[in-house]
Structures are given as C-alpha cells and as structure tokens.
C-alpha cells in the first residue's frame, strides 16, 4: 500500500509513488511523507509485521536522488525484519529515511524541531504499526523531540523515559558473536591470545575494544578520525594503530571487525584479508550478493552483521517494556547461541552463514504468519 500523506504533496511525491510501485518487493506498506512548512520529505517503509509491530530506526541523510532514498528505505526495512526475527524479538521490520542534510537549520541543514515533530505525526498516523528509533543522522535528542508527537518512539534519553545510547549493548552483542566464532573455529569461546583488527573505533568500536582487551586479545585499530584512535590508545596503551583500513586488512590478523561504513567486504578487500574470522558492528558489510561465497571459498568464517550487531535493537525493544539494562543485556548475550546455531545450520545445509541466517529468519517469519 502506498500513501500520499499530505493533501498538497501529490505532485512532489508522485515520482516517489512510482518508484515504490516498481521496487516494493513484498513490503507491506510504505508511507510517503511531506510537510512543506518544515521542509520534511520522508519515506517510512514497513517490510513485515508478521512477528509484531515493525521496529527500526530513522535515517536522516542527503541522498543523491529520491530513488536512492526509496531504495534505501526498502532495503533497510527488509534487513530489520531479518534482524528482529533472529534477535528473537516480537517485532517485524521497518525503517524510515528523512531526505536532506541532517545538520541543523542554523548550519545550513534541514533538521529542526518543527521538522522532527512533523515527522513524529506521520509515525503516529500508523497507530503503532511502526516503532521508530535512532539511526544514522538522528540522535537521542532528536527522538526526544519526535516523542512529543508520537508515543511509538524509542531511543529517547533516560530523562524522557528512554534507555539512551545503545552503543554499549551493540558492542556487547558483537563481542558475543566474536566469541561464538572463536568457539566454532578454534574450539574455545575466547579471543585470548588472538589478534583482532577493529576498523572504526567510534561509538560502538571503542566499546568493542574494551571487551577485547579485557578478554586478553591483541588489538589493532584504525579510524578516519585521529581523535577516536587517540581516545582508545589513551585507555589502552598497548593497542596498536595503523593508518588506514587497507593496512589493517593486510595485517596479520585472526579476526577482522568492520565497525564503520557498509560495503566493507568487497571484491578488493576479501582477497586481501588475512583474518580467519570476520565479525563486526557495521551494517550491510557484504558489498553485493556473492561476497559471502568468496569468503567461504577462502576459508573465512563470516558472522552475519545483522545477527551480531542486534544489541542496539534489543535495547530499544526493551525500552518499550520499561528499560531494564540487565534484562536487555541478558537478551543480547543470546547472540552467542544464535550465532552458533547459524554456523551449525550453515554446515548442515552446505551454505555460507549469511544464507543460513536468512533461512532461519524466513522460517521464523513464515511460522508466525501461520499462527
């Protein structure tokens, strides 16, 4: 279903409607949103509500075209369906994108209280079928503003009834996936004595380094922001820094952890990898279909990104229950068992782990539809 969501917006949103009809790919609903007064133009995509209300963040980005924005919303919503299913959450998958610069109006961007509140009203119009949260370009303070118009908002500040920053549990979940990978490959659920390369030590990556150092791993890092590397090395002086990702993937690693941009595993990086395991926090690590087969062909064990980085969505889902950190952490700890189950399914089916993960998620969604 497609909605033209503002009575004066039909001409501006007509192209987006055409794009949606041609690209919808099984999505249940897409809401095309426009508020001319605030400058809001957004897409809310609901991929599946088989397991419950769709849950996924709001991305605020200056897309090169409306087509790119629509496709991103559709792809991200689908990914959230799979992530939520494998995390064992009572939620389907959805995602929203706000089109434009996420900088404040005072800095030449589009972000303003009026725009965020207008967006919140569109989310509210879905009457609980979509629950939103932070994503790229949106932050806890933004969710506080959205929540003034919409009670189906997570990722809020603790002062406003939320759980705050989810990077701590995201990193914890990635660490559990890494422990499971070590168990599957080396027979022990520890990184002690292993060399782990972390690409990106920002919000999630620096917490992951904390876990690795505590576990006894040797850690090598890189980041495009020197200050992020300096912060990590100030906390952990034995951490080694290299100048760029290319240097990192060619280093003598046991585990490679992409924790920055998507597309980290591609036709250039996979042949250069020395690591036996890839397990990181970045979204959409596989640059295109088929990369997972290239990894398997080289004997590299890949822990699917949307499985191991689910700690963040586990946190925001728990926020709907009245956030309890210990309860959410216990749920995120289950990423260890889920990752092992995926590796077992991959061996049984003779497929790469990414394919096995998809099959398990699809099975859970299909079973929910028949109940």
From Swiss-Prot:
Pathway the protein acts in: Amino-acid degradation; L-valine degradation
Family annotation (SMART domains): ELFV_dehydrog (SM00839)
GO cellular component term, pick one: cytoplasm
GO-annotated molecular function: valine dehydrogenase (NAD+) activity
Regions that span the bilayer: none
Keyword presence, Mitochondrion: no
Name this protein carries in UniProt: Valine dehydrogenase
UniProt superkingdom: Bacteria
Chief location category: cytoplasm
InterPro entries listed in its UniProt record: Aminoacid_DH-like_N_sf, Glu/Leu/Phe/Val/Trp_DH, Glu/Leu/Phe/Val/Trp_DH_C, Glu/Leu/Phe/Val/Trp_DH_dimer, Glu/Leu/Phe/Val_DH_AS, Glu/Phe/Leu/Val/Trp_DH_bac/arc, NAD(P)-bd_dom_sf
Recorded name of the encoding gene: vdh
Subunit comment: Homodimer.
Reaction(s) catalysed by this chain's protein: L-valine + NAD(+) + H2O = 3-methyl-2-oxobutanoate + NH4(+) + NADH + H(+)
Disulfide bond residue pairs: none
